């Protein structure tokens, strides 16, 4: 039976590694009755290298740390002014395949940007969301025990320069773009509020419960 309630945790600015380990712990200890959660967060500057990542795609990290992680995909950058959203979803209970969850996440971003008259789209061969061949959102998931963790990163109002130190998602010369430059949401808070709406609608959640911080 599909969960009707989505619990949303507003985490603010949190370091990447502790958030990642908290996601792992939640996923490893959840059972068939555990609630689905959506974590809303920003991270200090960090490069994360997914399981498909190749070291040659990290060109010049400089003073920004590089963390090897257990999500799908290749290297990406997180930093202040970027909305990061982690869906901790029991896909088995929600009767979703992995591909459908990815499609739903991408569509929730596309729908949110459409609210601002931004024409965004997904690519079948390169997960994420794009505007005129520039990437505005990255996506990388891990499924364990039939449940998802990791998630999406939407560029809102950030310094995009660190993306030039890597081949984003393994694509040399891939240009990044952000919401603020396109007349989209101007703050991470605004983008998060809108994305919560579109994601919950697409996923069919009837009730949203908001929390500040992680569970005690």
From Swiss-Prot:
EC assignment: 2.3.1.181
Chief location bin: cytoplasm
EC class: transferase
Upper taxonomic lineage: Bacteria, Pseudomonadati, Pseudomonadota, Gammaproteobacteria, Alteromonadales
A molecular-function term among this protein's GO annotations: lipoyl(octanoyl) transferase activity
Name this polypeptide is given: Octanoyltransferase
Statement: the UniProt record of this protein carries the keyword Magnesium: no
Swiss-Prot/TrEMBL site (Lowers pKa of active site Cys) positions: 135
Binding, substrate: 71-78, 138-140, 151-153
Record-stated family: Belongs to the LipB family.
HAMAP family: LipB
């Amino acid at each position: 039976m599909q969960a009707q309630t989505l619990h949303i945790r507003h985490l603010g600015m949190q370091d990447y590694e502790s958030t990642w380990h908290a996601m792992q712990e939640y996923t490893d200890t959840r059972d068939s009755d555990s609630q689905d959660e959506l974590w809303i967060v920003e991270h200090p500057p960090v490069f994360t290298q997914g399981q498909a990542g190749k070291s040659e795609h990290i060109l010049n990290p400089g003073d920004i740390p590089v963390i090897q992680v257990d999500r799908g995909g290749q290297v990406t950058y997180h930093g202040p002014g970027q909305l990061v959203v982690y869906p901790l979803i029991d896909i088995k209970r929600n009767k979703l395949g992995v591909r459908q969850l990815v499609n739903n996440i991408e569509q929730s971003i596309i729908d949110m940007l459409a609210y601002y008259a931004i024409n965004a789209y997904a690519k079948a061969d390169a997960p994420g969301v794009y505007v005129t061949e520039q990437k505005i959102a990255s996506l990388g998931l891990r499924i364990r025990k039939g449940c998802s963790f990791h998630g999406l990163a939407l560029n809102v109002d950030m310094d995009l320069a660190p993306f030039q130190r890597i081949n984003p998602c393994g694509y040399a010369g891939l240009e990044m773009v952000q919401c603020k430059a396109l007349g989209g949401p101007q703050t991470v808070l605004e983008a998060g509020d809108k994305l919560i709406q579109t994601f919950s609608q697409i996923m069919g959640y009837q009730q949203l419960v908001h929390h500040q911080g992680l569970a005690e």
